[in-house]
């Protein structure tokens, strides 16, 4: 396993940091499997398979689950949190209150508390994090695949001898294209 290189996006006054892996480490987990479902909560981070996969035993179901009637399952036999971090490393990761505001008119999802989470639409356009403030292609949003990530079915494209993968955002919204 290759070491993980982290990009520090923000350091808070309480010495906590928001970090992003420079490479795509794993894949093959969809946001939610039923893309044909038109209920607004099907695009909520709080009810997503990928949230459960990322947080594993640390996953706490959303209060909204009573309304949505969704049973969230992790489609893999392991979670990212338990596989990527040792017990010591995991104890250093604190839970964060996660804002799940929407974009492009979709219904916003409820706030969650998570140790591992995807960036939001606003995060991916935040110039303080080193991104450009638009939806155009931006080299700072490119993420190269690890060998393991590539083996997990991440959708990718090749430039030269490098494979770059696409990554999810947690913000509910309509697709661009």
Predicted regions located by residue number:
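Collagenous Gly-X-Y triple-helix signature in extracellular proteins
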Residues: 1-177
């Amino acid at each position: 396993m290759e070491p993980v290189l982290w990009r520090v996006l923000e350091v808070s006054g309480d010495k906590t940091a928001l970090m992003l892996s420079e490479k795509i480490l794993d894949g093959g987990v969809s946001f939610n499997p039923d893309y044909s479902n038109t209920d607004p909560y099907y695009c909520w981070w709080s009810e997503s398979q990928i949230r459960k996969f990322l947080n594993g035993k640390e996953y706490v179901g959303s209060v909204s689950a009573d309304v949505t009637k969704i049973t969230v399952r992790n489609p893999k036999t392991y979670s990212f949190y338990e596989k990527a971090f040792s017990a010591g490393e995991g104890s250093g990761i604190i839970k964060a209150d996660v804002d799940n505001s929407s974009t492009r008119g979709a219904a916003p999802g409820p706030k969650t508390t998570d140790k591992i989470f995807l960036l939001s639409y606003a995060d991916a356009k935040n110039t303080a994090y080193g991104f450009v403030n638009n939806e155009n292609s931006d080299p700072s949003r490119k993420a190269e695949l690890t060998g393991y990530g590539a083996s997990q079915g991440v959708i990718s494209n090749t430039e030269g001898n490098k494979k770059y993968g696409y990554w999810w955002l947690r913000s509910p919204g309509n697709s661009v294209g």
